[in-house]
Amino acid sequence: MANSKSAKKRALQSEKRRQHNASRRSMLRTYVKKVIAAIRAGDHKTATEAFAAAQPIVDRMATKGLIHKNKAARHKARLNAKIKALVA
């Protein structure tokens, strides 16, 4: 347990940040899951719309440091490839 005043403050800040990041991470996963669900349903139009909504969220989370930029790029590339495969 934190003993000094500054350590207590850091512990509080850390917990607050953890909760905020957990919320953001959950939101990110929800957007990605919506795209995956539309792909599994075989609905190209819905998948494209869901991907268009998810793409800026993924980019924003990478910018904020919640996920690595390469992971964001990987998410977008794989989802986009699966959407394009629906048409072919």
Swiss-Prot record:
Residues 1-27 are annotated as: Disordered. One of its GO terms (biological process) is translation. InterPro entries: Ribosomal_bS20, Ribosomal_bS20_sf. Keywords: Ribonucleoprotein, Ribosomal protein, RNA-binding, rRNA-binding. Gene3D superfamilies: Ribosomal protein S20 (1.20.58.110). GO terms for molecular function: small ribosomal subunit rRNA binding; structural constituent of ribosome. SUPFAM superfamilies: Ribosomal protein S20. The keyword RNA-binding applies. Binds directly to 16S ribosomal RNA. Belongs to the bacterial ribosomal protein bS20 family. This is Small ribosomal subunit protein bS20.
